[in-house]
């Protein structure tokens, strides 16, 4: 083994971190913290459309994700929403692109190397539309547990998130086996809950049916959407029609992991957990309260 091979594990991370810091300083993005993002939602009653690495892969490249294959129409819409100028829609980017304090080592490393490959491309895309200096929300408000060193962050964020639907009627648009809020108290302070069940995979392929169903069943409720990349587009379209819609992503699973003090991304019984090994059969949910909330099923 030569000296280069010996020093490489030390040298490469140092150089990568230095380049990452240089990117952030030279082309900074204005991204609110998780708590400031929630305060903004509470004050302005706006909708949110979130972008993580999966949405970026579809929007900026010809890639798909685990539960949504690449779709050129979805890619086009994700590009459009990313550049939205609708004041009723808060576009959200990962706060880790601005500040990594408090994140665990795995999350820091992931977003550092992601940024080395994609940050300049993202900034260039935003700048072309004059959006580089726009203020963005934090896409990680629905993922406050697994990427963080301390559980206190998740406890604060979830406590504030619950204020958004305090005593409000909710319409959930979710994958068939997502079961948002079932078996825990995440939504226990809501006044009422209705559910539209959608395909667990490739939901965007049924997008028009989903959009029509929401229009049919909406009666002033706050809309919570857990539907992969399709949720980003749906939240934007609903905001354009005067509805408040929140793309909540993995919020329920993160809440379950927090309650369990999970150290790994474990399977949650009775719920589809795409980031864990889904070898177990999820099965049907016989909870009568959950079944009574379902107003529509749009399945593959």
Question: Which sequence ranges carry the predicted segments?
Answer:
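C-terminal functional extensions of proteins
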Residues: 230-300
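Structural motif
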Residues: 169, 221-222
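Conserved beta-strand scaffold positions in the cores of enzyme catalytic domains, especially
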Residues: 48, 172, 192-195, 245
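Residues at the C-termini of beta-strands that transition into short coil/loop
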Residues: 52, 95, 197-199, 249
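A mid-sequence, solvent-exposed acidic-amphipathic segment
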Residues: 176-220
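Electropositive, gly/pro-rich neighborhoods at or near active sites that engage anionic ligands
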Residues: 2-187, 299
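Glycine-rich beta-strand-to-loop/alpha-helix junction loops that act as flexible
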Residues: 226-228
